[in-house]
Amino acid sequence: MTRIKRGYIARRRRTKLRLFASSFRGAHSRLTRTMTQQRIRALVSAHRDRGKRKRDFRRLWITRINAVIHEMGVFYSYNQFIHNLYKKQLLLNRKILAQIALLNRSCLYTISNEIKE
């Protein structure tokens, strides 16, 4: 079998890997095999948590809206508030409603009075 001279290709690949793993702790930033494993693990976690972040923010928005609704005493439940929004065809998503609830509660109060039956 003939010898294959690869030159700088393997070194270039490892330096790219080292740049990616430079912030990892211990052997995960020093040893090539553990660097590759840790890189795969990091990318898997990043992919998983991109979806999780969307769910977490939706939960946060719902919690904020629910807290302000209970504080105002307009409706006794969050889901009834959202249901009445859809019935009146007001196109406000949960993110915008949460921002209104935080920054301008009187505006949310007027919205809730508009959609009351």
Swiss-Prot record:
Protein name, UniProt field: Large ribosomal subunit protein bL20c
GO CC terms, sorted: chloroplast; ribonucleoprotein complex; ribosome
One GO process term, biological-process aspect: translation
Species assigned in the record: Barbarea verna
Major localization class: plastid
Family to which this protein belongs: Belongs to the bacterial ribosomal protein bL20 family.
NCBIfam families: rplT_bact
Localization of this protein: Plastid, Chloroplast
GO molecular-function terms, A-Z: rRNA binding; structural constituent of ribosome
InterPro entries membership: Ribosomal_bL20, RIBOSOMAL_L20_CS, Ribosomal_protein_bL20_C
One family name in Pfam for this protein: Ribosomal_L20
Keyword presence, Chloroplast: yes
Biological function: Binds directly to 23S ribosomal RNA and is necessary for the in vitro assembly process of the 50S ribosomal subunit. It is not involved in the protein synthesizing functions of that subunit.
Record's keyword terms, sorted: Chloroplast, Plastid, Ribonucleoprotein, Ribosomal protein, RNA-binding, rRNA-binding
